Amino acid sequence: MAGSPGPGSDQVAAAVRLGETLGITTWAGVVGVSFGGMHALEWHVAEQGRAERVAVVAAPWATTAEQLATNTMQTEIVKLDPDFRDGFYLRFGTRPRAGLALARQVGMLQYRARDEFNERFGRVRQDVDEGPYAVESYFRANGVKFAESFDANSFITLSGAKSSHDIGRGRGSPERALQSSPAPLLVVGIESDRLFPLAQQRFIARHSPGSVSGHEPVVLPSGHGHDSFLIDQAWMSRTLGEFLC
């Protein structure tokens, strides 16, 4: 069953301990995107001196109320699937595929941009005039694919970890936390991101003395929403490469 999610700071601390066990005490760079960007920001603040430079891409300084609500809703959807069985589904030879697929579809609403959905699918139906809308088929197919490849308890645990993210927790304030680290920091935001809007990366850049782009983040000018970092790979490779080299 799903365990306690634990804050992202615990997960970063575990990664640091693993590195020490392997004999790695200093990292040339730490790069994180989305949830990984939350981890990268924690490296930047909590593990100063361990990474020579850090890149935070499409991630917030803290999870907002809207994001908390979405994470909670997705978790509840999974748990409402009768096959979830209080998290002990493997004992019964089942998996909450329907709940996990629907939770994924909810998340996808924020992973892509609104205009992209309209331009890509519009109100076109799939195959025949009375068939499902193309966007319905797209969401269902992606939900099913995700449910077949991802574990429900892992999904719940990771959702809880994302919800716990707050770089200012226990450090006085987010501003104080960010200002404490002078290490080179690349902050990248996505122009059309609905999941973690550009204002969140702007806050990080403005309060980070090591921000390599000053008080504004580097902006990926893409209309694909949060998933732009997966699509515009040439831009991402060039931007990250220039920072890390």
Regions found by a protein language model. Give the residues of each.
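Conserved acidic catalytic loop of the alpha/beta-hydrolase fold
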Residues: 9-29, 38
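Short glycine-enriched nucleophile-adjacent loop
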Residues: 37-48, 54
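Alpha/beta-hydrolase-fold enzymes
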Residues: 50-52, 56-145
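Active-site nucleophile elbow and catalytic-triad environment of alpha/beta-hydrolase enzymes
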Residues: 141-142, 157-177
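Acidic catalytic loop of the alpha/beta-hydrolase fold
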Residues: 145, 164-166, 191-196
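Short alpha-helix in the alpha/beta-hydrolase fold that links the catalytic acid
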Residues: 170-175, 183, 197-207
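Short beta-strand/loop motif that positions the catalytic acidic residue
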Residues: 181, 187-189
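Catalytic active-site module of serine/aspartate enzymes centered on a nucleophile-bearing elbow/loop
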Residues: 202-205, 211-245
